[in-house]
Amino acid sequence: MPPLHDIDISAVTSKSYPILAQLRTALWPQDSYEAHLKDLIDLCDNHGMTAWLAYDSNGTAIGFLELSTRPYVNGCLYRPVAFIEGIYCAPNWQQSGLGTALVKVAEDWAKAEGIREIASDTYAENWAARHAHQKWGFQETETVTYFRKNLSK
């Protein structure tokens, strides 16, 4: 892989939604490209989500980070909280420092907005993601189990 200094990280615009939708499909394959594209339009245009795409020196998209602002996040001390909704590095870019670079861009954005904490989540059994978050300087705060009950019966 090329050196990390050859990477360009750019804010997502409506013109780059199709590229981001393709990468989202790689991260979350249970949803179609079309569903991801529709979701992006809604989240970015109507709900204030911010996102960045990382490109290699050939202009190929190799990663992304999506960030929202939440009024509260479990385990955080301050409000509001910048929240990483999704982060992805193409397989050949994992453990290259690209994830760290994407998180740094999100941190800088949050600081510029006057936000004092950034948070994220992952499944408890996703050890690779948990390790990556610790490498990026995150501290685990708590593990939550969600419950549901169908009320339509």
Question: Language model features by range: what are they?
Answer:
Residues 31-56:
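Active-site rim helix/loop that mediates acceptor-substrate recognition in acyltransferases
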